[in-house]
Amino acid sequence: MQIEASPPSGNSSTIEKYDLSKKAYVLVLHHYEFKNKEHNRSGSMQDMVQIKKVLTDFRTDTLKIHSNLSLKSVQRAMDEVSTKDFSKNSCLIVFIMSHGDTKDTIMAYDGEMYSFQTDVVEKCTMNATLKGKPKIFVIQACRGDAEIQTDATRKIISDKKDIVTFQKFHKHQQSPQHYKNDLYSVI
């Protein structure tokens, strides 16, 4: 299967073609239990069951689920993604479920926040075997009251053109659990 993606008007006259004949690699960062029990996300396991159910209908090679990782463990997992060989995969799909906050940060098990842009997107886009392949992000987390910002002292050199991010809620909005009907209609 091939999918054609037209660039936004004014950017380029070429059309990107993605070869989706290979299976997708799916990574899930599922944070539902936290060191501070007040942050536990009851009901989140039902969302995970639905994600697994939906993905059985798709051509997925691997469903790699990381549950309740600390900040350092999330960073290690994403470092592995940055160097993993995805040449046998057509695309990368990343699900993130947790609490979120300002500047598109996401809460890890230990209550520490990691950056969606720096700790997740950057690690995926720097992987050479994902170049020219879709990288799809589905996030279930509140967004806080700020937009994504990058650290001006850090050089971001990876290619960001093959990314699709689904975030059901805009900044300043709460993100209720059991969003599956809306999410799955998008997928």
Q: Each PLM stretch: what is its role?
A:
Residues 46, 50, 73-77, 93, ...:
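Acidic, Ser/Thr-rich intrinsically disordered and amphipathic helical segments
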Residues 38-43, 67, 78-79, 106-110, ...:
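Short coil/turn segments at secondary-structure boundaries
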Residues 140-187:
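Active-site-proximal C-terminal subdomain of hydrolase catalytic domains
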Residues 31-35, 69-71, 98-102, 111-114, ...:
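Conserved beta-strand elements of beta-rich interaction domains across eukaryotes
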Residues 132-135, 161:
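A short helix->loop->beta-strand "cap" motif at the edges of active sites that frequently abuts
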Residues 1-95, 130, 150, 170:
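Boundary/activation segment at the start of structured domains
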Residues 81-83, 123-130, 154-158:
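Mature extracellular/periplasmic domains of secretome proteins
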Residues 98-131, 148:
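A short, glycine/acidic-enriched catalytic loop
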